[in-house]
């Protein structure tokens, strides 16, 4: 036996020999599963933002905490901060107005209407990758400047709200009258993993504008919020930038007037920074050394800040009063002819030809400059349609002010969902069509009314499949990213949702439910649709031998056609809904990946997704009434048959088409065909994580658990848009 004085013993006394060398491994290091299997299904996307990452705990209620906020005092502190120039990051012209406007804009500007992801609603700018995007250089300083204010007010104001409010206060401090402000953005505590920022592996990799119209990605280059300010791929051509500008702003549902107003308004205040070549700039925050404490882009040029600051590499000041609102942007745009030049960093920009030096230097009051513009600023003059709007704003400053106020409000609130989510004393009274407005409630059904309605629905001759399917069709449009969609409003009865192929059930079932609604007069159609699902689930559970009361809370209302923007709502039409075995377009992303995408939009966990798919299959809820995945001979019974039969080794599966979208399950011994299935169905037996979940419900003791878990997940989906609960 080895002892401590044994010369053959290499480890010192009392120490483990395995710890004698410098550690080379740690938790999470080494080759990961996705390195081996890059196409592995991202079930982990359904585990984001759980209570395990939230330091505030599950009982924290931001809406209640916000009520304790001294809103006026907070705004006063923000106003004071704007002119409290710090030595470590001096303010241009003694004011952080431009910096805070840019911070708010870049926080909100990542939103895209196609999938509802991105935007300012969760304070993601403080996390990677956004905190380190090339377009967000120096915004780490803006957020750090806000820290004393955040520290003072604590959880009464979220970071997400503070970023946006700081931008609003900056505009007000510049003399601009904003449209209003709604708080209500709740922080999360880790980066969003579900947002597709693109496949590029290099920062500022160029994308063609035509490709932007075919995907959800908002920017023309990886790491930009919108477009390259030097023109497409730094071409220096103002006119060619128009298509890229329309494509990127169009992904936020901004029209030409809103585009012109936003660009001009954002560039009425502040400046860009390009004191020297960007080679002086160090690593972004995520790659910066530990001692940088979350700050990045340390510059070796001069002081690295103030007059020596390098951000975009462009050195542009647009107006004569960069800390005061004016119409100088348009006046300068049309008053001068512009010649292409380069910034001290070598970036392409334009300077006013033969103009006097009328632009104040940000740090030396004795110095003046000529007016300068970005390549994309000149697009507003040389694109024919943009030029018409720009000239109108030139001649009518009040029209410009009104347009910018509304466009800025839309930009900073577009991902917040309905107006009912807004908090604070500055919420505008006017309802805007992009907020998906709803009328005031006119029905308050009592418990007795609800019982009578359930009886009427149960006696209407509708099957369990029909009852469940119509409720799912109504509620499952919800998107957790921008809080749009859902059952409230009964927009399933309106264009465009009633005409979607996936909602074919609506034309068959809604007339019956509408007749019940008219006869009763006690509840909205929206409530009756959800109540139909309640009746269907309760009947299906009872048929399985489990008695349940599915929770139901009335209070939904019915939207009017004039409150429904058809084009905007058509973006909610699913590419696929694996819960109903529906896929609209073949090819591209795998069907099972689209199931994960849909489940994530519905804010479901992996167990919730699993039990809902299995339950909906045996209830016969496929959109077209097909038998794919209906692994049961007792359709309409909320059984665990889907899981039992899927995991039965007596069945062997083979692809039934060339694309491996459909499969046939046959008896392993006889070869007799038993079932048909889609990729969504089989993934619960194929994927190791989902199979582990499926096994829970396939066990002998899984039936009752399945019913109760299904009811809980079902109720969650039905109430996703009930922000009043």
From Swiss-Prot:
Cofactor(s) of this protein: heme b
Annotated active site: 106 (proton acceptor)
Cross-link (Tryptophyl-tyrosyl-methioninium (Trp-Tyr) (with M-252)): 105-226
Catalytic activity line of the entry: H2O2 + AH2 = A + 2 H2O; 2 H2O2 = O2 + 2 H2O
Compositionally biased residues, Polar residues: 1-12, 23-32
A GO term for molecular function: catalase activity
Pfam (any one): peroxidase
Cross-link (Tryptophyl-tyrosyl-methioninium (Tyr-Met) (with W-105)): 226-252
Cofactor details (free text): Binds 1 heme b (iron(II)-protoporphyrin IX) group per dimer.
Stored CDD domains: catalase_peroxidase_2
Site (Transition state stabilizer): 102
Keywords: Heme, Hydrogen peroxide, Iron, Metal-binding, Oxidoreductase, Peroxidase, Signal
EC number: 1.11.1.21
Family the entry assigns: Belongs to the peroxidase family. Peroxidase/catalase subfamily.
Subunit details: Homodimer or homotetramer.
This protein's name: Catalase-peroxidase
Provenance organism: Klebsiella pneumoniae subsp. pneumoniae (strain ATCC 700721 / MGH 78578)
